From Swiss-Prot:
It is an enzyme of class 2 (transferase). Residues 41-44, 165-169, 246-251, 279-286 are annotated as: Interaction with substrate tRNA. PANTHER family: TRNA DIMETHYLALLYLTRANSFERASE (PTHR11088:SF60). One of its GO terms (molecular function) is tRNA dimethylallyltransferase activity. Pfam families: IPPT. It comes from Actinobacillus succinogenes (strain ATCC 55618 / DSM 22257 / CCUG 43843 / 130Z). Its cofactor is Mg(2+). Keywords: ATP-binding, Magnesium, Nucleotide-binding, Transferase, tRNA processing. Its EC number is 2.5.1.75. This is tRNA dimethylallyltransferase. ATP binds at G16, P17, T18, A19, S20, G21, K22, T23. Transmembrane segments: none annotated. The gene is miaA.
Length: 318
């Protein structure tokens, strides 16, 4: 869990759904506070995926550099565990320079991993996964779900009998460790050694967010989003099974290039998928376990002042 002790250095979290104005506000804060920005975004980590991720422009990055952007090729995978290790390293470096880490983004799972620590879950084992898949082909996933119910009733109650991926993972964890997924996830890792000031930004009216998402997606298309995905599609080492290609927008454009549906349909589906992502992000934030100060996307100047006031007040109380 997060530490609130004043003996710990300060960090700022600026969270929010996609298209809520996080980047613009972060750049403004970089101009007025002694902060260095760390990206908390599972799409911005990939090189060559600039337009569809709304990655900060070269000009914006020159004004306010973002760490943990463009660190991986799209063929590579990246986990919450990878992020936590990388983010803690960057936070330590920023703190050592006498500055404040400002973590900005909308990948809520990464924030959760950073604040709460990670359960000691084993890495995937392809051999065991293949064996489980083979059994499922013979008996059906419903039978394996019944097996899971005997091993781990709590997980079985949460997992739909048709959710093959989650059934496979829960059984895999048990076969590897001899312990249930429920038991292992109850064990948390180390607490975050920072006093975190948490902010979330979003429009008060969700229809405004929906409109912004549509306008931004159409702007991406004008800027050459399809051509960007075409370059990825031409690579033999990329597929829609990879996390990079599953990113909203990219998946829909990829399916269009594959011939699944037309260009206009890809745009429509991309907008819908982005809105669904925003809804999930807001749901995460509404259920956040630690205190969050909410900001209105339409009041950026006021938001900047509010964060400054909270920051300086926290520093006075140290």
């Amino acid at each position: 869990m997060q530490n609130n002790s004043t003996s710990f250095p300060t960090a700022i979290f600026l969270m929010g759904p996609t298209a809520s104005g996080k980047t613009d506000l972060a750049i403004k804060l970089h101009e007025t506070l002694p902060v260095e920005i760390i990206s908390v975004d599972s799409a911005l980590i990939y090189k060559g995926m600039d337009i569809g991720t709304a990655k900060p422009s070269k000009e914006e990055l020159a004004l306010a550099p973002h760490r943990l952007i463009d660190i991986l090729d799209p063929a590579e995978s990246y986990s919450a565990m990878n992020f936590r290790a990388d983010a803690l390293r960057e936070m330590t470096d920023i703190t050592a320079q006498g500055k404040i880490p400002l973590l900005v983004g909308g990948t809520m799972l990464y924030y959760k991993a950073l604040i709460e620590g990670l359960s000691p879950l084993p890495n995937a084992d392809e051999k065991i996964r293949s064996e489980i898949e083979a059994r499922a082909q013979q008996t059906g996933w419903a039978v394996l779900h019944q097996e899971l119910a005997k091993i781990d009733p709590a997980s079985a109650a949460r997992i739909n009998p048709n959710d093959s991926q989650r059934i496979n993972r829960a059984l895999e964890v048990f076969y590897l460790t001899g312990k249930s997924l429920t038991e292992l996830t109850a064990q948390k890792g180390d607490a975050l050694p920072y006093n975190v000031l948490q902010f979330a930004i979003a429009p008060e009216d969700r229809s405004i967010l929906h409109e912004r998402i549509e306008l931004r997606f159409k702007k991406m298309v004008e800027l050459g989003f399809k051509a960007e995905v075409e370059k990825l599609y031409a690579r033999s080492d990329l597929s829609p099974d990879l996390p990079s290609i599953r990113c909203v927008g990219y998946r829909q454009m990829w399916e269009h290039l594959r011939g699944d549906y037309g260009f206009d349909e890809a745009i429509y589906r991309g907008i819908c998928a982005t809105r669904q992502l925003a809804k999930r992000q807001i749901t995460w934030l509404r259920g956040w376990k630690t205190p969050i100060r909410w900001l209105n996307s339409l009041q950026n100047e006021k938001n900047q002042k509010k964060i400054q006031q909270v920051f300086y007040l926290s520093m006075q109380n140290r």
